[in-house]
Structures are given as C-alpha cells and as structure tokens.
C-alpha cells in the first residue's frame, strides 16, 4: 500500500479546487498580481500538487520561525526547509499587499495566473539567522545563502493558496507525475514497496548497480526520481539528463523501475534537505528513500572546507526516521572490479583487489577532449547522449571579447580574425562590430556607465547564444568597466570558451588614429562621459591576451589569438 502523506492527508489543491477553477480564474484577472521567480514557480507547483504536504501555502511568520529554529511547523509537524514567497517593498506598495488581501500569482513565462494567495501576514525574515540555522553557516559560498542575500527580496508574504491552473510543461510530459498521479500509477502497477532514488546528475553503471541492489535488498520496485527544477549552478541541464535517464531505463530488469520527474528547486541544504527530500518522496507514495553520502551537499565553503560532513545527512534522517515515516536506505558506494567484471560495494572490496573508477572531473575531461569512456563505467547509449550535449573542444563555440579604447585597433583585429577563422570552415563565425551593435542593439543608449553596462550585457547575451550554438563570436566593444566585462564572461562561458583580449593601445595613439574625430568632439563637450577623457577605462587585470597595436601588426595579433585557440583545442584536430 502506498505510504500515508506527511500530516495524514495529501494536500492536492488541484483536486480540492477543481470545481471552482473557472470562477477563480475570472477573479484572478481582477486582482493585483505578483510575477513569480523561477524558484517560486517550482515551489508553487509542489505546493499546489501536494508534493509539499502538509503545506497549503507559503509559510507565515510563525511557521517560518518554527521551521528555521526547530525544524517544525507551528502545529509541531516536522518540516526542515522554509518555503517562502519573497517580495520587495515596491511590490508590496504596488499590489497593496496586506493581511486578508487576495493576490494573483503569475507564471513568469507567460503571465498566466496559477493561483490566488490570501495574505495572512507580511514580515521581514532574519536572513543571517536563516542561513546559519538552516544551511549551517552565513557564508555566501553556499548557493542558498547567496540566494538569500543577493537575490531574495527583503520581505516574505505568508498565506494560503487556491489553485487556478497548473504550470504548463512542454518537455517530457509523459514522465511528469503529480503525487496523486504517481500514487495511482503505483496502484495500477500493484507496487506496494517502492524505493526512490534522488539525483541531479547523469546516471552511469554504478548508479544502476546501487539502485538495483537497494531494490533487491528491500524486495521493492524502484522509482528514479530526478530533480528537473533548479539544481546547483553549473549542473548539466535537465534536457540532457532526462535523455540519459531514458537511455538507462531499459538496462533495468523488466518491470523493476519507473522514471518520474520532480520539478523541485533544490537549496543544496545537506542534512536538512535530505529530510525534506524524504518527506517529499513520502508524499509521492514511496515506502523507501535512498540517502547518499553528503546528500544535497553544495561542496566547499569560503575557507575551502566542505559545508557538511559526509554522513551528516544520513545521521539526521536516521534521527527523525519515525516522524519521516518511510524507511531510509543508506547509499552504498560501489566500485568496479576489472578482475571479476562486476560492481561491488566499496566496503566489501577484499584487501589487495584492484578497483577502477572515473571521477566527475575526469569524465568531463574525456567528454571535452573526445577521449574514450570505457563501457565498464557507462553504457554506450548514455555516453552518446552526453557527447551530443558535450562535444569535444573543436566542435564547441567560443567568444573572443575585445576591450580597449575607441580607435585602439579592436575592429581591425576583429575583422582580420573573422577572415582567419572563416578559413577553418568548421563553424560559423559572427562579428559583433561596435558600430553595428550600437546601431542595431543599443541605438537608444548613450555613454553613461549605466547605458554602457546595458550595451555590454546585450552583446554578451547575443554572443552567449551564438556560443551555445557552436559558433565563434567576435565582440569588439570598448567595455571600459571591469564589472560589466566580468558579467559578460559569466553569461558567455557557461556555453563555451571565453577569451578576453585587451587591445592596450595608448590614448595618445588612439587620438592620432581617430579618423572620425570622435575624441575632438568629446574634447569640445559635444559628447559627454567619453571613455579615456572624462570617463574612466578600467584596465583589465584578467585578460587572456594583451595587444598593443603600436608594437605589433594586425597579422601578428591575429596569430597570437589563433595560437591561444589552438592550444586550448578550439581549432585544429580534436
């Protein structure tokens, strides 16, 4: 029999409010509204479908403080992670958010109303206290703490929800089950004992082995329940991961395993998150849950030490297992024995027996360089999916981002580089010349710091999309401010290579080379806040290459860039 939901009743607000959704939708159109963030959208979906039972809304102050301080709601039920709706002072004033007010919550993708919140209270959370107690340290190296201090707004709104409609999904719809649907699916399959496996990473042979062992030891079936909401920054995208999971599923014994996707926004909260994950799986009807070593750990703190001990998560779920109400299965690390061609638990390896493993870092290196990935480590079908999403360097996109004063020679080098790269004929090459991007992307902008930063952000977005598509993007703005350059790098490098090239031609030479007389116009006061004259140029301290056109020719400069790309494998043989 499927497990009883946390709190005794599954809070499926879609079912509860099904008879009045038409009237709720009509009312929502008349109400002040809040457009949700991506994390709030994930939280709302699990509030509405019962995944966060017993919650029926975002935490009010009393529940919030209880969860932060004692891991309990005001009614005494165990709950470890605050589920809050953060808003700004401006949103409060604009929507007149106050107790008893009804607010429509809108999907950020299409602005459709998803729910109506009846406000109970508005309060200012103690973010440092939340960071210290929930996540173990007020350290912004932790992604959830960084979110608290740098992204989350200053106030929380607590209140109860009514469901208008569910968020739309257009990907992997057949694998998205609400708790109600998954419980019905288990009933149809006549599954009475189900082990759930949580993951935010691709799965390989070792994962298949450890999950099969867990299911066999418990005489249970298996639910692969990966997170497809928000995970740790830098994780592999969920589209790739789901293709991996689908490639892996036929490797399980027939009828043993099912795949269901969980739209959860992870906090990487370690021990507390492990308890939270177990409660969520309990609500989805499973009877057992695998908790791993350093479960949901974010890695190192700002001092280079792990935020959590390797077994803290397992210890906390063990402490509260009677309240969690499902059996916790400790994650068994397995390792490959080439002598016997099998995976065996790491703690059962006889002394002197050779074992093999490939780390995540080594796997990424092999994917980037095109080196073989042995079949003992992963299935060919899985490797094929990963190679499609992670081609070798000479098939990846990259951006060459020039920075330097006006008339420093950036455009001449950029155009020559475009011609040189076109000789390769292995990828599309796009040049975002400064005069073109000003005219086509930022014609309404001036030369203030704010306008320059916006201009750079727009160019970085375009370059990032080109890089994502496997093209070579050449960008040649002045880009005088380090903060904007660093933001551009962050935008682009998640999709491929990024090289900052400083064209360090002296100001005096730039003035001599200025055929358009821009510097003279700036000196006469016709152009305000002009870089190099009455606005600063922050010299890069992190450039990948520095070029002075007075000391080398355009051809020499291009050759240096080509050598840099060749060294890193972006051009030439894989």
From Swiss-Prot:
Gene3D superfamilies: HUPs (3.40.50.620), P-loop containing nucleotide triphosphate hydrolases (3.40.50.300), Sulfate adenylyltransferase (3.10.400.10)
Localisation per UniProt entry: Cytoplasm
Major site of localization recorded for this protein: cytoplasm
Site annotation Transition state stabilizer: residues: 204, 207
SUPFAM superfamilies documented for this protein: Nucleotidylyl transferase, P-loop containing nucleoside triphosphate hydrolases, PUA domain-like
Assembly information from the UniProt record: Homohexamer. Dimer of trimers.
Protein name, per record: Sulfate adenylyltransferase
Naturally occurring in which organism (per UniProt): Mucor circinelloides f. lusitanicus (Mucor racemosus var. lusitanicus)
Primary gene name: MET3
